[in-house]
Structures are given as structure tokens and as C-alpha cells.
């Protein structure tokens, strides 16, 4: 079910959709685009028909159903340019629901006059994580592929695009909407790790194609930071105290290695100062009143930094247990 918050009047909107996937390329690209250009949310997809809970959660002995993933539509009105509709899904549904979910979304954006759409995806390649990733395109329309060539985007000759970032394009074609996927190269050995450089190159191409005028310097800084951390962590994992430059094509990292890198990247993530101050405020409140711990946990999860604060968060409960035991 899609609930409309408002009904904007849009002119020939281009539709862009994304879900989480390899390297977080698609998801992070759309998050950046939405925040950088000030898109306004106008509808919410409540995907209860497409997601089923796999378990229930327990909090202080009380059982409850988990919140199901949702998706949000937002829009941007532009002068003398086609407007844009964005859709950002919080998670991909089981494969058997992918086509039905795609139809629901496509039918909705057609109502607003969308006749073309874009998705993003990762293209794993045997490249170094500091290499400048190429951008490829696959489309339902030959003319679009030719229009993309001047921006350094190469046509994908063969392959497949898995998940909703690909499936929705097939549904769009069936519904009369031209669909194109932009794929950013990422290293084989870091498919589970955020890759802002791939997102940056995709958005650079998109910005040129749609005349967006994006400032991508924040992604450039984030790319440098993550690449340096991967260098240090790969060196540490390989047992090198003074990590030498990573080989051009390193061997794939194990799941444990990837988990370690993810945790370290989370620990070093640069939150805005205002957010850190708000988190510290929640900690102080929770020390006085444990009912505030739920709000603290939600804030940590929202910013994806729970692991950074996990020990301190759990210490709140240990301290409470000791105080109860002393009474």
C-alpha cells in the first residue's frame, strides 16, 4: 500500500529508484542525491504485503513484532528541466515478491507522468580499491545508451543485474517506461563494504546527464577516508605492522575480515558534532532514567553507530543490575 502525504504537480518526471545492494552503491547514491538536492517526501510505501516477519523481538520479557521495511517517495521540482521522483527502499523483499512490488511502484509513478527511470548497481571487477571505477550502463532503449556515451559511460555488452535494482527495469519496460541502470565498478574483495567512490562516479555521470550540478566533494572525502582505513586494516589482517601498499588485485577477504573492517569503519565514522552531542545527552538521560535507553538505541541505530557505543550502552544495564543488587 502506498500512502500519499501530498500530491505534487510534476512535469515529465524522471524516476530514480534504489535499494541496498553490493557495496551499498545504489542506496548510498540515492541517499546522497536526496540530501544534496533537498528532495521532499510525498509518499510512503508500506510493504506489509511484500515482507513477512521471520521472528519476533523480546525487550524486558515482552514480545513484539518487528517493524517491517518501508520505502519513501520524494520529489524535486526544477525550472526548465524535467522534475525528478526518487524512491528509496529500506530493504529488498524476498525474490518471489520482487515483481509484484515493482509493479506497485511503477503503477504509482506512472500516475505522475514518469516515462523514464534509472536505477544504480555495483559491478564487481578485479580492481584495486583505490582505482578509479568505471561506469557502465544497460538500458531498454538504444538511444539512451548513445546519449550516455559523451559522459564516459560504456554500454554493458552482457551480464545480469540481480535484485530489485534490475528487476524493476524489466517491469518498467513492460509498462511502457524506458529503464536504464548505471553500474559502478567495485573490487571483488570488498563487495560487502561501502564504496563511495563508485557512488561518486555514478552520480558524476548522472549529474552531467540530467544537468544536476552536484557538488560531490563530500563523497570524495569519504572515499579517501575509507580507502585509507581498508589499507591499514588489510595490512593488519595480513600481519603487517607497517602495512605496505595493497597488491593491485588482493585475494578476497574472509567474512571475519569483512566484519572487522566494517566495525572499524563504523568506529571511525565522522558523525556531525551536533549528532555526537545529542547522543551524549541521551546517555546522560539514560543514566538517570533507564526508560530513556530505548530512545538512545534508536538514535544509535539511525546513525549506524551502535557498535561504536555498544560497550557503553551495555554498561548502562550492568550498572542498573549492580544498583538493584545492592538494595
Language-model segments: which ranges?
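Short amphipathic alpha-helical interaction elements located at domain edges
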Residues: 290-327
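N-terminal short beta-loop-beta anion/metal-coordinating cradle
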Residues: 1-89
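Intrinsically disordered, low-complexity linker/tail regions enriched in Pro/Ser/Thr
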Residues: 174, 201, 205-273, 324-327
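Ordered, amphipathic secondary-structure segments that act as subunit-interaction surfaces
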Residues: 80-104
Amino acid at each position: 500500500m502506498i500512502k500519499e502525504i501530498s500530491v505534487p504537480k510534476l512535469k515529465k518526471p524522471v524516476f530514480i529508484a534504489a535499494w541496498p545492494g553490493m557495496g551499498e552503491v545504489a542506496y548510498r547514491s540515492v541517499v546522497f542525491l536526496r540530501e544534496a538536492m533537498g528532495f521532499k517526501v510525498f509518499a510512503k510505501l508500506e510493504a506489509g504485503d511484500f515482507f513477512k516477519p521471520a521472528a519476533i523481538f523480546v525487550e524486558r520479557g515482552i514480545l513484539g513484532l518487528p517493524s517491517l521495511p518501508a520505502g519513501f517517495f520524494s520529489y524535486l521540482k526544477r525550472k526548465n528541466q524535467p522534475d525528478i521522483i526518487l524512491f528509496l527502499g529500506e530493504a529488498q523483499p524476498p525474490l518471489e515478491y520482487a515483481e509484484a512490488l515493482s509493479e506497485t511502484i511503477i503503477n504509482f509513478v506512472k500516475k505522475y507522468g514518469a516515462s523514464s527511470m534509472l536505477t544504480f548497481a555495483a559491478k564487481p571487477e578485479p580492481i584495486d580499491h583505490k582505482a578509479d571505477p568505471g561506469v557502465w550502463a544497460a538500458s531498454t532503449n538504444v538511444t539512451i545508451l548513445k546519449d550516455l556515451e559523451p559522459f564516459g559511460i560504456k554500454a554493458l555488452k552482457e551480464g545480469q543485474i540481480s535484485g530489485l535494482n534490475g528487476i524493476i527495469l524489466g517491469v518498467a519496460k513492460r509498462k511502457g517506461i524506458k529503464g536504464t541502470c548505471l553500474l559502478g565498478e567495485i573490487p571483488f574483495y570488498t563487495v560487502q563494504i561501502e564504496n563511495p567512490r563508485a557512488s561518486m562516479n555514478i552520480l558524476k555521470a548522472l549529474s552531467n546527464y540530467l544537468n544536476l550540478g552536484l557538488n560531490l566533494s563530500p563523497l570524495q572525502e569519504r572515499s579517501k577516508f575509507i580507502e585509507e582505513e581498508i589499507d591499514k586494516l588489510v595490512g593488519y589482517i595480513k600481519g603487517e605492522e607497517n602495512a605496505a601498499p595493497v597488491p593491485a588485485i588482493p585475494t578476497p577477504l574472509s567474512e571475519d575480515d569483512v566484519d572487522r573492517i566494517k566495525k572499524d569503519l563504523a568506529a571511525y565514522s565522522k558523525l556531525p558534532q551536533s549528532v555526537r552531542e545529542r547522543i551524549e545527552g541521551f546517555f546522560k538521560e539514560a543514566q538517570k532514567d533507564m526508560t530513556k535507553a530505548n530512545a538512545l538505541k534508536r538514535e544509535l541505530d539511525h546513525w549506524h553507530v551502535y557498535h561504536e557505543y555498544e560497550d557503553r550502552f551495555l554498561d548502562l544495564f550492568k550498572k542498573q543490575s549492580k544498583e538493584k543488587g545492592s538494595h
